[in-house]
Structures are given as structure tokens and as C-alpha cells.
Amino acid sequence: KEGYLLGSRG
């Protein structure tokens, strides 16, 4: 999901 803007977790 939006993990790419947090550090690639989603």
C-alpha cells in the first residue's frame, strides 16, 4: 500500500 512513502512496507 502506501509503504513506499514510509520505507517500503506495503
From Swiss-Prot:
It is found in: Secreted. GO terms for cellular component: extracellular region. GO terms for molecular function: toxin activity. The keyword Transmembrane does not apply. It comes from the Eukaryota. Expressed by the venom gland. Keywords: Secreted, Toxin. This is Toxin To61.
